[in-house]
Amino acid sequence: MSAETLAARPSPLSRRGRLLLGLLLAAAAAWATLGLAPSDALPGEAGRGILRLFLEGALSPALTYEGSDVPADAPPLLARVAGALWRTVVFAVAGLSLSLVIGVVLGFLGARSWWEDDERECAVRARARAPVRRVLAAVHLSVRVTIALMRSVHELLWAVLLLAALGLTSFSAVIAIAIPYGGTLAKVFSEMLDECPRDTVRSLRAIGARGVSVFAWGLLPRAMGDMSAYAFYRFECAVRSSAILGFFGYPTIGYYLRLSAENVHYREVWTYLYALLALVGLLELWSSRLRRRVVMR
Amino acid sequence: MSERLRRLHRARPRSRFVRASAAVGGLCTAYVWCSGAVEAGDFLSARRRENLVRFLTEDSVPFPLRGEGFDLAGAWSWAGEVLGGRGLQAAVATVAIATVAIALAGVLSGCLAPLAAATVATERPVEPAAGGGRPAWRALRLIVRAGMIVMRSIPEYVLAFLLLAVLGPNHAWPAVLALALHNGAILGRLGAEAVENLEPGPLRSLRGLGASRRSILAAGVFPLALGNYLLYFFYRFETCVREATVLGMLGVVSLGFYIQDARAKLYYDEMLLLIGLGSVIVLAADWVSSRARRYLRSGV
């Protein structure tokens, strides 16, 4: 970088400074809007009692039911925890596998490199005539809009919608995860495809490859590592989402956690929390080992 | 030629672990879909279809448009009333919750990140041999990292639910604190990585000049790591807005509160309208955060 370009640019510190100042002002305004009182952030008399109970529960998570009003046919607590954990994973696996299909299809169709035909890209639009190109551009735009809309509604809100439309069925939980996750995967996949190095693409084009084959052999293998690492990371998120779907009546871990908390059985709450933490921790370990092997640096 | 290709193919990098992971993933997926654990067929049953048709053709249609009295002006004023009244108020509250939460998360992660970074939290910071350190330093890093793992593994929704029982429902703190703790832990981890990946040269020269740990942090680590950190920060802001919307369903007054309210009253038309409003807010936050990131990178 030469001296002129350095002088022509404003210093990066001032840019950050402006952003931070804006952020501070926004936070102050938001604080005032919400009317937050710092004293309310600490528990009151009753809250302290609950907090004490809750923290005591952390040291001695329940291994059997805490209450005495357990129905005779209820499974042992640990079996119930294992079942809830298993169903949490089942919903997450089903939701993520569906969203992977959506993510790959929409991610390809949403990637600029799938459509455009300037020098660096592999073109599907390249050989089409002008009116066809306009139609294809419209398809590209509508795919991107669809991705944004799928992503912009939280999985819990999709669940609420699907509960109203379909009622309580495990398939509605799966779709509630699959739609927003499909959108997120599609967005990230298309960005990864557009941003991955173009060297292979260039050499393939130089030896005469065109169109989809450049995409499939030049671009996809370069982005594949990042894409699979990200997909696995999303699985971890899907497990968390699946867990909280239980708050809406699905039989995942959130359902039992909520029941126990509402009955003030905090030792049982901790059993569920520890189970969820162990599962997520295990997945995180797995995901980081996988990332080290598949992500190209 | 083909012999050479075959040899290259055989010599490609492979990993047993990756293959085993893919196999486990594939088997689990096949099992989940084939075993009947997910009732995909039930989706097509007559009762569900009926429910779906009723939802689409009656429940979700704005009520002034239902049946005989097709009243477009009425629908318009109904939408204006819902969106302009509680909709607007809840939208402002949602964004405000997310903003306060992300600011607190920023402060929290600023405290945690240096404590978790192996290059700083050690008795001889930023020196070439840094990284190990006495057991006390190692224990400190381990505790901070473990705490962050726990905080980011518990979903915000569960955190807010538990905080609601402790703090009471009459203010926004349960939602704000849940988001701040969860995101503070995530940003703390990312910040610690940003600190560890810093170019060691400038920091070592500060150390060579005799700077203390605190001055190295203030004059070297924070300014240098801030750029990368802020990129993550604005990315998390978007997620915060998304989550702030739904935390309302627990009883804090954000958009989710009114969505839950409409749902409980079976006003599905109003519920859809509010969900649409939530979608607009999230898209707006997405736009703001991507603009902020672009501004950081290139100044536009």
Please identify what each model-predicted range represents:
Chain B
Residues 12-16, 86, 90, 94-102, ...:
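Loop-to-transmembrane-helix entry motif
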